[in-house]
Curated annotation (Swiss-Prot):
Two zinc atoms per subunit with no known function have been observed. The keyword Membrane does not apply. Stable at 80 degrees Celsius for 15 minutes. Its EC number is 1.2.7.6. This is Glyceraldehyde-3-phosphate:ferredoxin oxidoreductase.
Length: 653
């Protein structure tokens, strides 16, 4: 297929526009894999300017089909070690007016720089706007009563809005977390009439894209937009409602509106549960399997987990329903979409993963307390999942006396036991959430030596802390044993998504996203788990490759092959192509020195072992009781062996 590419060298201030045509490239991830291999980025550190950041839209942006306008970022992750896609909802809707498919960022700017991409309808212009580092730090600390990514967004709006007069545009920014940690995200808020739209916030966060953007390239923001333009599809014009509808209805044999509504009910509104969105749907579904207190579920008796879940429903879920669902405070990510999945209240966008990681996982089950922690974590520009997992780990370490509050930059010891949550849910939550907010500022700004070490990630930090504080550890104990992450190679790591799901802990070429089987509460035979992981990963690859929102996967999966044929006249063996590209991701990882390893955290091993018992697999539960470590190794090896066979490569212990 044909794509247009803009190559920017931010160090030399050089711009090159290109058209590429390749039979095996159908989207951003395909293109990114090709370019990173051509540039051999596996040879260099993730913060080397050679580690290009590629971002762009998929081949169906510009269509009328909802969900097709995610902006995809592709880079080598400083956390996990390999190539990584991270996607941002809705931002492709404004980016399509720039008039290119993909942008490559090369080189390193001398000073913190904003890239400005504008298409006035006649030509595309690229400008660079510099900010002194001291000024940037000042803005992050406070601008017009806000901080971090919110402050920088407003500052750039005030200074750059006139550049885009009469045009639709959007700004993507990083926060201080990108400067001082491996877990910096890229934030963007939809704009309406030049003002930030409440609740319409989105992130490209997983894997640390913000950190790469700033630390490899010294880019702090990208402003993009232009005059409205129509995308030309070489085949059928799917920017025409009637044409797109015909394709969807031809596959599903029912009205497009019904197809979309039925398959997105969880994300819009579920009348059976009287709630909607990921936050509304997940808490009732997970029950006592909700991750709490740094994943201590294996050590908390079921009846007490049930009590904690009842308190979560009362103090977390019910206020959300009253303040967001009942008054219908729902919006979109910035593209026209009937799902309106962005639920918000009191100026806060409320999504399950950030509010879970920086809420119950970090010792807060009171919604108004978590508003403080989540907003601070977001403002600092963290990947909220990665940071929440890190904060939960730090709070437990401080509670156990392995780290001291002053060392990590917080004011007190947390109340971090099941009894604290059960007997004083509000007070314990308020204290813990306040400490998470303090920790977010401490780590983002690198306020202490230990805070700067923690910013590297749990696994990388543990290697240093094990040596630094060895006198605090008992024989054979490691800081790693309290951390929950999926390991890769010697130092690769990523925080799993917020489900007690065995598939979340398997070291796959892409983890921490949904390229796995993330169903909680089931313990499958290893070969069956591998099969379900592959079935999921092959299609998650495609959603990222074409920049389509996965909330639409229920109807879009069946339509995608037909869309390629109708709009572009190309026939693709979807699953075979995905397998081929996953093999390329694996080859890249091996060249970079990353292969699967056994779990090096006792907490992760306990989650898997206890999972076998809790989720009702008696055979494996018995084996784990007899030999926990040996059984864990056997299980993981069998999963990876079966995965390797299904993908057609070698990816095993």
């Amino acid at each position: 297929m044909k794509f247009s590419v803009l190559k920017l060298d931010v160090g030399k201030r050089e711009v090159e526009a290109q058209e590429i045509e390749r039979e095996d490239i159908f989207g951003v991830v395909d293109y990114g894999i090709m370019r990173h291999n051509e540039l051999r980025t596996y040879e260099v550190d993730p913060y080397d300017p050679r580690n290009i950041v590629i971002f762009g839209i998929g081949p169906f942006a510009g269509s009328v089909l909802p969900g097709s306008h995610r902006l995809v970022f592709f880079f080598r992750s400083p956390l996990y070690g390999g190539l990584f896609p991270s996607t941002m909802g809705g931002a492709g809707y404004q980016f399509k007016n720039v008039g290119v498919d993909f942008v490559e960022i090369h080189g390193k700017a001398e000073k913190p720089t904003v890239i400005i991409l504008k298409n006035d309808g006649e030509k595309l212009s690229v400008d660079f706007y510099e900010i002194e580092l001291e000024k940037l730090l000042d803005v992050w600390k406070e601008y017009k009563g806000e901080e971090g990514v919110y402050a920088l967004t407003q500052y750039l709006l005030d200074n750059l809005a006139s550049v885009f007069e009469g045009m639709e545009f959007r700004i993507a920014v990083v926060g201080p977390a990108a400067l001082n940690t491996n877990m910096g995200a890229i934030f963007s808020q939809a704009l309406r009439n030049g003002k930030r739209a409440v609740g319409s916030e989105d992130w490209a966060a997983r894997g640390g894209p913000g950190s790469v953007l700033l630390r490899a390239h010294n880019v702090v923001a990208i402003a993009f937009g232009g005059k409205k333009r129509k995308r030309e599809f070489p085949g059928e014009d799917i920017s025409d409602v009637k044409v797109a509808k015909r394709v969807v209805e031809g596959i599903h044999k029912k009205a497009q509106r019904d197809v979309i509504n039925e398959s997105t009910v969880k994300y819009r509104y579920n009348p059976k549960l009287n709630t909607g969105g990921t936050f509304g749907g997940n808490y009732p579904a997970e029950g006592d399997l909700v991750p709490v207190l740094n994943w201590q579920m294996p050590y908390i008796p079921k009846e007490e987990r049930i009590k904690i879940h009842e308190l979560i429903m009362k103090y977390y879920w019910e206020p959300f329903n009253k303040e967001s669902i009942q008054p219908k405070n729902w919006t979109t990510c910035g593209e026209p979409c009937p799902v309106v999945c962005k639920k918000h209240r009191k100026g806060h966008h409320v999504e399950y993963e950030p509010y879970e990681a920086n809420g119950p996982l970090s010792g807060s089950i009171y919604l108004y307390a978590s508003d403080i922690s989540v907003h601070a974590v977001d403002a600092m520009g963290f990947d909220a999942i990665e940071f929440g997992g890190t904060a939960a780990w730090v709070l437990e370490l401080v509670h156990k006396g392995l780290l001291k509050p002053a060392e990590v930059g917080i004011s007190d010891v947390p109340e971090f036991t099941k009894d604290d949550l059960i007997t004083k849910p509000v007070e314990a939550s308020e204290k813990n959430a306040k400490l998470v907010a303090e920790l977010a500022h401490s780590i983002a700004f690198g306020k202490t030596e230990v805070a700067r070490i923690i910013g590297m990630g749990k696994r990388k930090a543990s290697k240093i802390l094990d040596e630094k504080f060895k006198d605090r550890l008992s024989y054979g104990e490691s800081f790693k044993d309290y951390g929950v992450y999926t390991p890769l190679g010697d130092d690769g790591e990523i925080n799993p998504t917020m489900y007690w799901a065995i598939g979340n802990f398997i070291p796959l070429p892409i983890q921490g996203r949904y390229w796995t089987f993330y169903q909680f509460g089931v313990f499958l035979e290893p070969e069956e788990l591998a099969q379900k992981i592959v079935s999921s990963a092959l299609w998650e690859f495609w959603y990222d490759n074409v920049g389509w929102c996965r909330f639409h996967r229920g109807w879009m999966k069946k339509v995608l092959k037909a869309l390629f044929m109708e709009a572009y006249g190309v026939s693709i063996d979807m699953e075979e192509h995905a397998k081929k590209q996953i093999r390329k991701l694996i080859d890249y990882l091996k060249k970079a020195g990353y292969e699967p390893v056994f779990w090096d955290s006792m907490r992760v091993i306990d989650l898997v072992a206890k999972g076998s018992e809790e989720f009702g697999n008696e055979n494996w539960a018995k084996k784990f009781k007899e030999d926990k470590i040996g059984t864990a190794k056997e299980y993981l090896k069998r999963v990876l062996d079966a995965y390797s066979q299904l993908i057609g490569t070698e990816w095993t212990l």
